[in-house]
Regions:
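Terminal amphipathic alpha-helical/low-complexity segments used for targeting or macromolecular assembly
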Residues: 1-2
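Membrane-interface amphipathic segments in extracytoplasmic regions
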Residues: 5-314
Length: 314
């Protein structure tokens, strides 16, 4: 049986004391020392993977326009993309950022852009921008998913901890106090990024300003059309069966079931997400600030925001 670490304990999930083993400490030190080598390795390998992705998108375009699953990181968009890919006759390109200022250049650069948005690095970014936006004026179907900003922030901080936020202490994190981890989260993460994404990515790319146009909060999904873009926006918290139904109505065909994908617990440092989630119960001011963001105000009605507040404070 797995033993759960008490929220205020500095001990790791799998036994041990409050101090990490020497081997764990050394590996964190080596991670920092290895940064320049990782950067060089990435510079050599990334273009090859990018070229492979560019060929794949060209092949998809030759068969017909793929659906662009375009959503911020850690919003459950992988589950939507997987369902569409399992649907006969449908192919997808999944990407989180299409604006170059949000492309992360690697471990020697900042993970936060000048506009306050979280950056990301993926082989689909430049290929999708070039082939689906710059080199084409054909109609394009787009799916985006919105996730509550508190869940978004905790999930991104822990899932990408090894790459960005906790890179220098990722292996030691299970031994660190919850208070220390939460303070680091508060001090380093771009907390408004999930809301900024809708302005600096989605609106910039599609011309659709969901904050101005509004959202069907009780239903949890809405279709937007502007020029060549036909967009379906889903809220992550609605039932997966409702997501499937909305996609089927939008595409006018049956869609494979939407199922959970890309779970956070396989990437985050053990126990850290759960401890930060527990610590959030004592942070009503933070919760209120996140629920006051334009994205939360647009995608959730007052009753839904109250329910979210109660959930995070439980």
């Amino acid at each position: 049986m797995t033993r759960t670490t008490p929220p205020n304990s500095a001990a790791p999930i799998a036994g041990g004391g409050t101090k990490p083993p020497l081997g764990v400490q050394l590996r964190d030190v080596l991670e920092t020392a290895n940064t320049p080598f990782r950067h060089v390795q990435d510079l050599l390998r990334f273009p090859i993977s990018e070229a492979r992705m560019r060929r794949r998108i060209r092949e998809q375009l030759a068969r017909g326009a793929p659906i662009l699953v375009y959503s911020a990181t850690k919003t459950a968009s992988t589950a939507v993309a997987a369902a569409l890919d399992r649907t006969p006759g449908i192919e997808t390109v999944k990407v989180h950022h299409l604006q170059p200022e949000h492309f992360w250049a690697g471990p020697l650069s900042s993970p936060v852009a000048a506009d306050g948005m979280l950056r990301h690095r993926a082989i689909e970014q430049r290929a999708a921008r070039e082939l689906l936006l710059q080199d084409s004026d054909q109609p394009l179907k787009v799916v985006a998913v919105m996730r509550d900003p508190i869940a978004f922030n905790l999930s991104n901080y822990t899932y990408f901890g090894r790459a960005y936020w906790m890179r220098h202490f990722w292996r030691r994190a299970p031994w660190m106090s919850t208070a220390t981890l939460f303070d680091h989260f508060r001090a380093t993460f771009p907390h408004t990024s999930s809301s900024l994404w809708w302005t600096h990515e989605f609106a910039t790319t599609t011309g659709i300003d969901v904050f101005r146009e509004g959202f069907h909060t009780s239903r949890g999904w809405q279709r937007y059309q502007r020029g060549r873009f036909d967009c379906m926006v889903l809220r992550a918290d609605i039932d997966d069966r409702e997501k499937r139904s909305a996609l089927a109505e939008w595409l006018d065909c049956d869609v494979a079931p939407v199922e959970r994908e890309n779970a956070n617990d396989q990437q985050a440092a053990p126990g850290v997400y759960e401890r930060l989630k527990e610590a959030m119960r004592a942070e009503p001011e933070y919760i209120d600030a996140m629920l006051a963001l334009p994205s939360a105000q647009t995608f959730f009605n007052a009753a839904q925001r109250d329910a979210l507040r109660a959930k995070w404070l439980r």
